[in-house]
Amino acid sequence: MSLVKLQSRLEHTLPNGRLEVLPVPGYRAIKLALINADFSAGPLPQAVMNAVIEKPAYWAFCWGSGIALARYLRTHKEIVSGLRVLDLGSGSGIVAIAACLNEARLVVACDTDPDARLAIEVNAAINSVSVVTTGNAS
């Protein structure tokens, strides 16, 4: 999958954002394409704020809850090993990727946002794992 295409999707919402492939804090075996660490935390111009509200690029951030669950799977591999896993609201795909790395038989990452699904595909490729993506869990 294309990191260039994902970068373009990020710039649609955050024109000054850029993706960096970095190891996840606390689970360095996983690398994710995330928004640059030095991205401004200051106020955004009104047009950018409107774009963020309309189509947030939440998939460009690795949420603490995702890191915590990925780390939990690493230390409790038996929860996913040999099983089928469905990751709902997958975002960046960290939990789906952790399930793959901990020997899940099949991992499906579900997110309603097509940009998040692209991020999951890109991040799975970065980590050399296979994740099925879908926008519908039914």
Residue ranges of model-derived segments:
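N-terminal auxiliary segments of SAM/dcSAM-dependent transferases
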Residues: 1-41
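Domain-scale activation on soluble regions of proteins
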Residues: 8-9, 45, 88, 112
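Short acidic/His/Gly/Ser-rich catalytic and metal-binding motifs that mark active-site loops
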Residues: 40-44, 96-98
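Glycine/charged-rich beta-loop-alpha catalytic/anionic-binding loops adjacent to active sites
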Residues: 46-55
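Conserved SAM-binding loop and adjacent beta-strand
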Residues: 56-74
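Conserved SAM/SAH cofactor-binding pocket of Class I
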Residues: 70-137
